[in-house]
A protein has these predicted regions:
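Helix N-cap motif at beta-to-alpha junctions
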Residues: 135-136, 177-184
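Short proline/glycine- and acidic-rich turn/helix-capping motifs at secondary-structure junctions
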Residues: 163-170, 200-229
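Position-specific recognition of the canonical hydrophobic site in helix A of tetratricopeptide repeat
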Residues: 1-2, 36
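Short amphipathic alpha-helices in soluble, non-transmembrane regions
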Residues: 142-146, 185-195
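Charge-rich, low-complexity segments
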Residues: 25-143, 158-160, 223-227, 233-309
Length: 309
């Protein structure tokens, strides 16, 4: 139902499933995922919907906070809402997306790269504006900025904790752009906003495609001043990409609903994961949350290992 764009019917179906079995993991995940894009008008509901509604009502206080302490206080309120759940839900996600209604089909592209040792043609037009920030609180501020940031086009953006062992850095934000010219224009607008939000403006830069690609093909990651010198899709890769699609076609999804521009239940489960990561790397900005139990020990351990290198 969700994939057909029938969101209200999907909510009713998940609602029914959860009323029968409140700890039904798949229904919980699907419900939380759907609530990122849709708020039901009314649900005579399991706790899940009520908590999402409370967090969405709390969201403006975080989005428009004027100090770090205000952000921290409101995060604490939202995290306490999660404790109202009677079941243990652990999100598999670690990135907060504000996605548009276009599926970039990144799963396909990553699989082609990993199985065929080539970069798919689509990815040669993919450019991102990346921002790196020093602390957990700054990552929340960046996420708020991404929710409020208004482009002529609704570009997908995300905030992440870096977990990939061969990629440097900790806290990052990325905006997906269609081509280098758009990325340059977005960076100019973003830099103005970053100056307003942060006392010390974080560094932003344009990168091409996924970070793994230039590790294998360094020329792909180079963005020369003369655009004619940029690496283009090698013709000899075309049959390999075609063969992949013949063997294992991964179609982009239709009927994608854009994310709501606000914090929601899904985000707060991810924020809990970010806090555990921050504890692992010794980030002082989470001092207020230091007594909260670690919910994601695997993330805490990965972060701790990361901080040792």
């Amino acid at each position: 139902l969700k994939d057909q764009g029938k969101l209200e019917e999907a909510i009713e179906a998940y609602n029914k499933a959860l009323s029968i079995k409140s700890n039904y993991a798949e229904a919980i995940y699907n419900t939380i995922d759907l609530l990122k894009t849709y708020s039901p008008e009314s649900v005579e509901s399991p706790n899940l919907f009520n908590i999402d509604d409370k967090i969405k009502k709390l969201s403006p206080k975080i989005l428009h906070a004027t100090s770090d302490s205000e952000i921290i206080d409101n995060l604490a309120v939202g995290l306490n809402y999660l404790n109202e759940e009677s079941f243990e839900y652990k999100t598999p996600l670690s990135q907060i997306y504000k996605h548009n209604s276009v599926d970039l089909n990144c799963k396909r592209h990553a699989k082609i790269f990993n199985t065929k040792d080539i970069i798919p043609k689509f990815c040669f037009g993919c450019f991102k504006v990346q921002v790196e920030v020093p602390t957990f609180i700054d990552l929340v501020k960046l996420t708020s900025l991404f929710y409020k940031f208004d482009f002529e086009e609704d570009l997908t953006r995300k905030s992440i904790i870096e977990l990939r062992p061969n990629i440097s850095g900790y806290y990052k934000g990325l905006i997906y752009c269609y081509g280098l010219d758009q990325a340059k224009a977005v960076k100019v607008i973003l830099d103005i906003s970053l100056n307003k939000v942060f006392d010390e403006k974080p560094i932003s830069f344009i990168k091409r495609g996924c970070s793994e690609y230039p590790l294998k093909f360094p020329s792909y990651g180079e963005i020369p001043k003369n655009p004619k010198k940029i690496m283009t899709f090698p013709k000899e890769w075309k049959p390999l990409e075609k063969k992949f699609d013949q063997e294992e076609l991964i179609e982009p999804k239709d009927n994608i609903t854009a994310s709501l521009p606000e914090f929601c239940l899904s985000d707060f489960y991810i924020i809990q994961k970010w806090i555990d990561y921050a504890k692992g790397i010794g980030d002082q900005s989470i001092e207020t949350f230091i007594d909260r139990p670690i919910i994601f020990p695997d993330i805490y351990k990965k972060a701790k290992m990361r901080s040792m290198h």
